[in-house]
Regions:
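Residue-level recognition of conserved beta-strand positions in structured domain cores
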Residues: 35, 67-69, 93, 112
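A short beta-loop-beta micro-motif enriched in histidine and acidic residues
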Residues: 26-30, 40-55, 76
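Double-stranded beta-helix
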Residues: 96-179
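Extended, charge- and Ser/Thr-rich helical segments
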Residues: 15-18, 46, 80-83
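Short, surface-exposed secondary-structure boundary micro-motifs
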Residues: 85-87, 92-94, 113-115
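Short acidic-glycine-tyrosine-enriched beta hairpin
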Residues: 55, 62-64, 68-89
């Protein structure tokens, strides 16, 4: 398929939001994520990283942030949020909370970076947003994008939570079950994706 060349663009946006790669030109690997104002703007979804510690800072608006078993509303006054490796996390707009409803009419802007700062986050986001932009219509287009997205996630340390696991057996067992479920389901999707030509990253999207 013909892919849009986006590798040199400083910003990539789709209707729900997008990424600004140029806000911190003196700090490579730092990205600003925009979640547009609106009732139907999705969040990041629960996921975890295994080779990167992630740092998150709200620049504008209010974010409802989940880290492990704790969820709270954060604003720019709350400083830097640290997400340790293997810790499930997500964030979204906080419009439906008492603390966050004041920001319901403004875009949520969250700044992200990682340790190590190896540039992998930018490669991940560039490929993810570009795949969504290039998605073909119809069921085949949706399936193709899903397989491509899973392949990119697998190769760039982003693991979605398909099931949080049983809490009754304790956190250690819960984490093992969660990883097993994600690796099994995601691994099958990635294997099939690679068989049909999906790649970890695309030269049209990657600087």
């Amino acid at each position: 398929m013909t892919r849009t060349v986006t590798r040199n663009q400083d910003k990539l946006f789709i209707p729900p939001g997008g990424i600004d790669f140029s806000s911190q030109t003196n700090k490579p690997g730092v990205v600003d994520i925009y979640l547009r104002a609106g009732d139907n703007t999705p969040g990041t979804g629960l996921h975890w990283h295994e080779t990167h510690t992630e740092y998150l800072q709200v620049v504008q608006g209010y974010a409802l942030v989940t880290i492990g078993n704790r969820t709270a509303v954060f604003s720019k006054d709350d400083g830097i949020i640290t997400v340790p490796r293997y810790t499930i996390h997500q964030y979204m707009r906080a419009d439906k909370t008492d603390e966050g409803k004041a920001g319901k009419d403004v875009d949520l802007v969250a700044r992200e970076w990682t340790e190590p700062g190896d540039g992998d986050k930018e490669v991940f986001f560039r490929n993810m947003i570009s795949l969504i932009m290039d998605k073909k219509d119809g069921a085949l287009g949706t399936v193709g994008m899903l397989l491509s997205v899973m392949t990119v996630c697998w190769s760039h340390d982003n693991y979605p939570v398909f099931w949080k696991g049983p809490e009754v057996f304790g956190e250690a067992v819960q984490q093992r079950v969660r990883r097993a479920v994600t690796f099994s389901l995601m691994g099958c999707l990635v294997l099939f994706g690679r068989l049909v030509g999906c790649k970890p990253q695309y030269p049209e999207y990657t600087p």
